[in-house]
């Protein structure tokens, strides 16, 4: 089965997420099972961020300080360009999506970059891999604090379906479920970091299993609350268009700005891939902490769709970069936004 899935155009983990959504739709947790699923999801989120804390190396982030301009551009793309585009899209087309889906788009826009796929695609494209590792690591370290703050600020300005910023209760949850476990992981990294790295494959299963549990709990609550009547095929198509437009805009802007600022081809590749990624692994648990439980299932839909889009688009773009490594593309060339 795994070999079969590997040949499909859809990411294997996305297939597992969709299967989890289907299970939640058919067999949602309710009655006594609902609080049990919620408690298990809470523990899973804390475990995820503890493991993130153990894995992320502050030294790796600081090691790339000499690439200051590169890191600044990645940071601005991740935490300024994306949010600006998302807010502009919502302001121009407020009725294109439901308030919950727009809240999900804004959350997507303020998430940190990914580490694994950013580095992997940079490597495939023959880019600056050490700088990619530093930039993506720094993005995740900063995102632990900055993402909730930006989400609260931007969602409070647009009245996205009542998602008006972060409540005091949500602040407490952020501290208990995200910051404290992450800080504990960072503190214990010198002692258990090596063990975690050696057992990365096994703990990767724990990571993904925890995320699937969070998704099951979120979608179960959405089913019980009856929120899914607002989503039909036409709405999903519009969401796809919004996500594709966001990704295409960021890929194009980061490419053109990198070239006009005189970055090398290797650094351009790093900026494009690190600056256009959004972390599914961070976003799903963060959404469960930041938003009312019944709406989380809808709010994470934009992120789940964007994750698949970014993998397909960046796989095609990485192959294009690798094929043309000896001759830089002219500044006027367009960047493919999808595979």
Question: What does each model-identified segment do?
Answer:
Residues 63, 116-128, 229, 256-259, ...:
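Helix-loop junctions at the membrane interface of multi-pass solute transporters
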Residues 90-146, 151, 155, 160-170:
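Membrane-interface helix-loop-helix junctions at boundaries between adjacent transmembrane segments
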Residues 15, 77-85, 110-115, 131-154, ...:
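Membrane-embedded alpha-helical segments of transport systems
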Residues 280-339:
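C-terminal transmembrane helix pair
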Residues 112, 244, 248-250, 267, ...:
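Hydrophobic alpha-helical segments embedded in the membrane of multi-pass proteins
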């Amino acid at each position: 089965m795994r070999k079969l899935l590997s040949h499909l155009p859809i990411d294997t983990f996305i297939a597992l997420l969709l299967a989890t959504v289907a299970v939640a739709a058919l067999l949602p947790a309710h009655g006594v099972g609902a609080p049990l699923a919620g408690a298990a999801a809470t523990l899973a989120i804390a475990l995820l961020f503890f493991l993130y804390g153990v894995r992320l190396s502050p030294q790796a982030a600081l090691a790339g300080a000499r690439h200051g301009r590169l890191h600044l551009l990645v940071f601005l793309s991740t935490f300024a360009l994306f949010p600006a585009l998302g807010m502009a899209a919502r302001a121009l087309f407020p009725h294109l999506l439901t308030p919950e889906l727009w809240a999900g788009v804004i959350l997507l826009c303020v998430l940190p970059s990914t580490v694994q796929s950013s580095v992997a695609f940079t490597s495939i494209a023959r880019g600056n891999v050490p700088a990619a590792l530093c930039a993506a690591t720094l993005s995740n370290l900063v995102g632990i604090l900055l993402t909730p703050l930006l989400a609260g600020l931007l969602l409070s300005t647009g009245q996205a379906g009542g998602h008006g910023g972060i409540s005091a209760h949500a602040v407490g949850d952020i501290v208990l479920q995200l910051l404290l476990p992450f800080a504990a992981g960072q503190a214990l990294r010198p002692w258990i970091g090596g063990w975690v790295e050696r057992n990365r494959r096994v703990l990767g299963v724990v990571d993904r299993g925890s995320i699937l549990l969070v998704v099951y709990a979120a979608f179960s609550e959405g089913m019980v609350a009856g929120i899914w009547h607002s989503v039909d095929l036409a709405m999903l198509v519009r969401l796809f268009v919004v996500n594709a437009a966001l990704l295409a805009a960021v890929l194009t802007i980061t490419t053109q700005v990198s070239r006009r600022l005189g970055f090398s081809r290797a650094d351009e590749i790093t900026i494009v891939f690190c600056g256009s990624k959004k972390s599914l692994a961070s976003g799903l648990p963060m959404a469960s902490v930041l938003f009312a439980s019944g709406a989380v299932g809808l709010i994470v839909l934009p992120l789940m769709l964007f994750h698949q889009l970014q993998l397909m688009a960046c796989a095609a773009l990485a192959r294009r970069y690798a094929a043309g490594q000896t001759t830089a593309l002219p500044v006027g060339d367009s960047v493919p936004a999808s595979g």
